[in-house]
Each structure stands twice: as structure tokens, then as C-alpha cells.
């Protein structure tokens, strides 16, 4: 049977991964600003003599004076543009009109990478997934009988509150607002301006509604609509004086004040309600109408008699994405409201003082500046851009969160809200999500998914026939309800055997109405365009992940985001082909904007001579610190005089090679136990990984100090620091700043600073009184507040910046010192593969002790074989074997996952054929042995003997993660204690002590250290008197005395029991020891 799949010859390419951020910001700039300026009201004074007005259609933005690249690394600059709006002030009595274009504030600009630069720091706004505004129906069943007792309709507003309509078993309809107590629906209808006659004429079931009204009137005793408003306020918000709503005008004002702000549906909510209830209300009517409530009551009655459908609240058609445009437009609206209040107060104040207001005296930029500063600095969904490596940056910009204001909370979110729904396929990745309490609440966008102008997720599908399936202009974009009407083939292509009978019907797997079924190919209307269409950017680079358990694929995708850039980047031998797009869209790779000839190239810039005779000068990033303290650096990939085409690579980033992500290394690994040192995910490595800088990474730490004017005088930056040894000041210049290029150690001063001391404070110091009394000498009037290198912070100073904020009236000076560190891999560092196989370096072996191959090559890393079968991540075996073949053949493989759709065991056949080819072409027949395919005999480096069993070896792409022992190792002899329990504080940042928990107790018990364990749990921990004595006893070499009192934790327990009215009385433990009641 011949099937023509070429009738639609559209070429599908990967979309720009920054698209969702950039398009949303463009929508805010082009539409959102104008919409809010058009809604800005006319402002009048109390005498209605002056009128102020803004004209939104003529606004304009000024291009920022600082370039995008410069603002990112200047620590106080925000990348923004100035907003100017025409304004008019009318003086009605005199007929004077003044018009002026006013500056109302700065709008933060999004960079070309989809990020915002706020105070020199790259930030990103996470998209939020919320329940879409509209109406949703659900039912509640009796737990005993199983029958439906209540039908609930929930009307969700855009930014306001929720209204619930409940039809109970007694045919009574109630409503409630935001989980407050329920009130009769008749109150709501009468308060909205309806009467009984109009209600009965509008509904489709007047008999049922008549009974509801009659019972409600008997109970509520409501006769007229003004009384209904008063009763409504009284029952929902407390008591209300009825005289306040006696007049019709006040009634109308209260009705407007009550309904419009609380039930603003927005255009999306209006669209959903019209679609669900089959209404013809104009889309510009964005507030809840009485007609909507009556139609909702009708639909509830229909559900009672078996007509209509309930809604699945977890379906993506009932959810929308609140993007950057929505957040910024909402904040801009809030800023304009604050500006309107400010203008109103100022115009009234000036008219009361008999002064003539001017436009300049009324308008200020403070409301807009403060509102956006508050949003970017404190809003939960405005986050630091994760810049650990290029792949991390792309993933962070494509993330969704169900948390945040208006969303779910991670503590009470149900399993159903976190679970995978059939509607997410092709739109949200079912694998990549956070681990822990945020699992299922934070997810990533699939690679071909997009967001429409309503905020709904779409997926790209291929039409099989020339039928009109979608009304949208883009004929290949299917919205979230497409699977409700069409059969969608889940295979990207259809493989047909040439021996098949032409008349035989061919079946394929398809998706229809949230179900997966087998159907005839002739009934297929749509099909997916790629087998990777279901997954996100973080999952797609994992080779052979179809052979992994989903939990391990999740861990692998998360750990790829934690990989640090290495000293010498190396791209993976085995990949999936998606790597180049991720690297280019991350912004770490420099791409040629036009074709031309390389006219000049060095480590800092590249000049391209284009065809028209002009030049394009591109500055490169050199040793810049990222938000995660990793190094951002770009290296030229072109030579002088080379001719380039548009789109070719000019420079690679710190973690890219050849335009592909290169955050790891192709390491020769062996899966075997080795003396127990790789037990429980521990990893053994060869010392050559240290000497050859294979896993050496570069980190840049930023240290900050502020010099300001205090009450006792200005702080001084100087090299002359009293009472400090000259050795610690050896790197300072005459201004007290460290010299760039200096190698500094722990304790060295990098910024010398003296702070004035209060004269009275100087005399309080004992030596001050002594010097004053004997010699008449005043102690130094300053104290040393230098910035010193902290423990573990040694390195080379690469930059020193002194910054004076322009808008600061406190004359502050900020000094930033950047120190570069080269960190070699060491015991305690965390490494991982791309399949969730992670471990900690437990031992570094000499290269002569490592097992070696039959050609003499020593193994570079030994992994535990027990970590594969129980975790079910077999993809790592396919990767390392294919990587071994590629290493010998000098080839790189790009294998799209799910290759089993072509034939059974396709992955295994590919690996074995490449291993066999490598063995034949390199004269190493041991690479593929028929008796043990994929395994080889290894030789013990210590004895020279062959191991008894063949061992799986290969080249795996291993990553060095940002969880490094240099950042975690910590020790203290004594330090701060908790005031309540008197136990050491927790954490390195607080100078905390070792927390002896359950596993630590087991470790000490395993070594038989019973006395050490007893001391750590008692007297060294929370016994105040005993821990002071034990220091002297240890120094003097004397035995440790047994304490005579109880530890503080036992006293705390006794006090807590007393709070529960349980008193511990005297108890004789021994004849010579009685617990004293007073001590408790």
C-alpha cells in the first residue's frame, strides 16, 4: 500500500526558544501601554475648574543611552527607556489649555536574550499558569449513597474574586464569594437590578426558578431591590445602615462599586463564558452581567436533569498562561492609579492655596519608578537568571509556575493538580519538573509549543489532508481543544513495508478526547511533526532517554542545569541534534549577523567587513561573573581574512564548542566494584583528571564593601591600617584598593577601610582608659573595617570597580572586587551523567593502580554497576558503548530518541554495529566480542592480572556539578549557640556546628567511638557549664568530669511539658544523685 506523506511540503524548524519572552514583551510595548494610558481617567479638582488628561495614543519611548551589553556588567545600571506621554491641563473658567509632553517614568527593557537587567543583574520573569477566567461546573456526591447532591458553578474573574453558585438537593440555589458563608441567589439577582418578572422571562426553566424565588422570598422577606443590596452587604460584609442605600443614585453607585472591581472577567473570561453558556454578549463587555448569572443557573438546572457536561479543571483548555505582558501591564496599571491619586491630591492642594497648577508640578516619575522597582525586586516570579551554563539559561526562560500570587501553594496543592494530564502532551514536558515539594507545580514548555494571544498553549501539528481544520491564520497551530475533535497520530512518520498488501488497512496509534487508541490511518486528520515534540529543551539533549525510567530522566534533565563550565570545553560524542539550537538561543554563542570577511580579530573583539563596504564590530565577553559565580567568557572561532556567511559562528562561549553546549567531558568509564570505594553511588577517578585539568572549572566570586558618611564622619579608604601586619596589606595601592592581577590568600585585605569611632566609645575601651590615665594619650579615633578574603576565597583579582550611584544623595561609594578561582576536581565533589546517574568522588587513585584496557589505556572513572538495574536508566549503557565506538572512530553521533519506532532493538543494533566497525577499522577486535558483546576484559593495574569477568566499558559524557566541596566544607571548634536549646546553630553561613543526626550516630557507632558519641550528644552540645570546663580539661590533658546538672535540652523538654500541664516531680535515680526540682 502506497501512502503519500509529501503532499504538505512545509519544512518545520525548531522555534526560537526565547520567543515566548520576546513576543510577550513586544505585546506589552505595542498594546499594553496604550491600553492602560487610554483608560487613564480625566482628573478634576473639587471645584471642577481644572482638568488633567493624558493622551496614550501619542506616547513614545526614548532609546537608552547605555548599551545592552554594558548595562549587564555595571553594578548599578538598569536597562530601561524613558516614557513620554502628551498631557493637557484645561482651565475651564478662563478657557486656557496647556499641552506638554511629560516624562512619567522609566520602563525596564527586555534584552535580546529575553531577560531584564536590573541594577546590573540579569533577571527573568517566570510565566505563571493559572485557572483561566470563566465558569466551571463540578458535582459533589454523598459519601454514603454515592448520588450527586450538589451542583457547583464557579465563576473565576480575571484579577478579582470568585463567585460560586450551588444547587443543592432541595432545589435551592445559593451563592458565595471567596469561600464566605452562602447567601440566597435571589439576593444577588435583585441586587444586580433584576426583578421577579424579568428573571422568569429570561430563564429557560421558569417553573423551577419560580419555586426557588418563592422559597427565598419567604425566608429572606425581600420586597424591593434597594433592600436587596443592603441585605447583601449585611450578610457578606457585616451590618450596613439601610438609610445609606435608600436613594436610587446611591444604590447604583454601590452596585458599581461592588460588582465591577470584584468580577472583572476580562476578554478571556468573557470568551469562555460565552462559549460555555452559549451567549452572544459582546467581547468588550468584560464585567459580570445579570444575564451571565441567569445563564449559569440555567446550566446548573440542565446538569440536574442530565443535560450538559462537567468541566475538567486540570485540562489545559481551562488554564491560561500569565506572561510577562500581563505582569507588566498590571504593574503599569497600578503605577498609573498611583499617579492619578498623586495628581488629584496635588491639584486640590494647589487650588486650595489659590495657586495655578502646571503640568510639571502635577506629574512626577516616582509612582512608575517605585512600582517597577518593587515588582522586579520582590515579586515571587521575578527571579535571578540561572546562568550556570547556556542550557540553564534557555530552560529558565521557558519555565511555568503554578505558584505565586493568585496560584497554588506548594503545601496544600493536591496530587491531582501535580499529576500529568493527557492534554499537556505536545505543550508541557511530562518529565522535567522540580524535585521535592514543588514537583508538578513548576514545569517547562515543550520545544514546539507556543502561546497564543489569549494566553492558551498551542502545539504544532501537521495536517494530513487539505481540509480547513482551524480558523486561525496559522494553519499548523492547534489549540488545546484540537484533540476533542480530531484524531492526532502520535507517530511523526508512518513506516510501511513494501511487501504489504495494497488493500490491507494500516493502523496507527492516535490521540482523541484524552484517550490513546489504535485507529485506521485513513481517519487521521493531524499528526505530530517530531518524536521530540512532547519534551522540553532540558530533556531532548539526553540520548536514548526512551530507555530510562522517567524519574531518572527527570534527574538527568535537572542535573544538566547544574553543570559548571570547564577549563577546556568538549562537546559530547553522542547527542540528539538539538544542542546547536539551545546554544545559539542562550546568547553565549556569537553569530554573524551578515556575511563578510574577518577584518580584525583578537580576544576582545571581532570586526567583520560586510559586502556593502561597512563594518560590524562585535565585542566579546571576557571573564565576566555570572549570577551563579561561574565564568562567562567568549573565544573567537574565526581567523583573520576568513570569509563567513550569515549565521556562522564567530565566537564560542565558556561552555560551548563549535556552537554546541559543552558542559561536560567524554570520560572513559568502567562499571565495576573496586574495593568498596564506589559503594552507594560513590565514584573513583584517575588522578590524570586533575593533572590534565579535565574537570577543572573557573569560578568568579564577587566581594562588596560600602564606604559612606557616618554620624561621626566619613569612612576612609586607605592603605594605612593600624594594628595590622604589613603582610596582609601587601596587595593594596595608596587608595586602599587591591591591585588587579594580585594573588590573594585567606585573611588578606583587599579593601582597606577605617570607620570613625565615637569619642565616648573610645573611652569605654579598657586600654583607652589606661592610656588616657597614665600617658594622656587618646586611643585611635577610628576602627578597622577592612574587607578581607574569607576562608576558601583565595584566588586572583581580575577586576576592581568603584561605583558612585547617580541618584544617591547619601554620597555612598560601592567597591566591588572580583576574584577568579581555578578549582580542580577533588574528593567530595559531585559528578553526574545525563541519565540521572550521580555520585560523589570518594577516592582519587594513581593512574598506575587504575584498571586498564587491552591496549594499555587506563580507565578514567569507575562507576558502580549496582546503580543501573535498580534505577532502570539503561540509556547510559547505550550512550557509553556508542561513545566508545565514536572515540575510536573519531566520530560524533546525533541519534534522535525513540528510534525503536523504525524496528525492534534498533538502539542495540546501532551500538553493536558501530562497535564491530570500530573493532575492525582500528585493529582492536576486543571492542566487540560475540561471546560478551559490549563488554571487555580489563587488567588490574595493581597486579597485572586479568579480572575474572568481562566488564562494561565505554565513553560517557560526565558533568561536574555546581555542588562542590569547596563551597560546603566547614569546621569550627566553638561558635554561636541557639538561645532556646543552647545547641550549635545550623549551617556554614552562621558558623554552625556539626549536627549529629541519625546517620552520624550510625557512623560513629560503626567505628565503636562510644565515648566520643556520648560527649557529642551531651556535654559538648548543650550543657552550658560542662562545655566550658571540657575545653580546659582537654588542653590540660585531664579526664573529663561528669556533669552534676542536667543539659539544657532536658530542661527545655521539662518546660514544654509544663506548658501542657504536665509537671516532672522529684525522682531518685541513684542514692547519691537526686534531680533538683529548681534546676528544671
UniProtKB/Swiss-Prot annotation:
SUPFAM superfamilies hit by this protein: beta and beta-prime subunits of DNA dependent RNA-polymerase
Localization in the cell: Plastid, Chloroplast
CDD domains associated with the record: RNA_pol_B_RPB2
Enzyme Commission number(s) of this protein: 2.7.7.6
Magnesium found in the keyword field: no
Taxonomy, superkingdom: Eukaryota
UniProt record, GO biological process: DNA-templated transcription
Gene Ontology terms, MF aspect: DNA binding; DNA-directed RNA polymerase activity; ribonucleoside binding
Pfam families: RNA_pol_Rpb2_2 (PF04561), RNA_pol_Rpb2_3 (PF04565), RNA_pol_Rpb2_6 (PF00562), RNA_pol_Rpb2_7 (PF04560)
Keyword set, alphabetical order: Chloroplast, DNA-directed RNA polymerase, Nucleotidyltransferase, Plastid, Transcription, Transferase
Recorded GO CC terms: chloroplast; DNA-directed RNA polymerase complex; mitochondrion
Substrates-to-products reaction catalysed: RNA(n) + a ribonucleoside 5'-triphosphate = RNA(n+1) + diphosphate
Keyword DNA-binding carried by entry: no
InterPro entries the record matches: DNA-dir_RNA_pol_bsu_ext_1_sf, DNA-dir_RNA_pol_su2, DNA-dir_RNAP_su2_dom, DNA-dir_RNAP_su2_hyb_sf, RNA_pol_bsu_bac, RNA_pol_bsu_CS, RNA_pol_Rpb2_2, RNA_pol_Rpb2_2_sf
Main EC class the enzyme belongs to: transferase
Subunit organization: In plastids the minimal PEP RNA polymerase catalytic core is composed of four subunits: alpha, beta, beta', and beta''. When a (nuclear-encoded) sigma factor is associated with the core the holoenzyme is formed, which can initiate transcription.
Role summary: DNA-dependent RNA polymerase catalyzes the transcription of DNA into RNA using the four ribonucleoside triphosphates as substrates.
Family per similarity comment: Belongs to the RNA polymerase beta chain family.
PANTHER family: DNA-DIRECTED RNA POLYMERASE I SUBUNIT 2 (PTHR20856)
Protein's UniProt name: DNA-directed RNA polymerase subunit beta
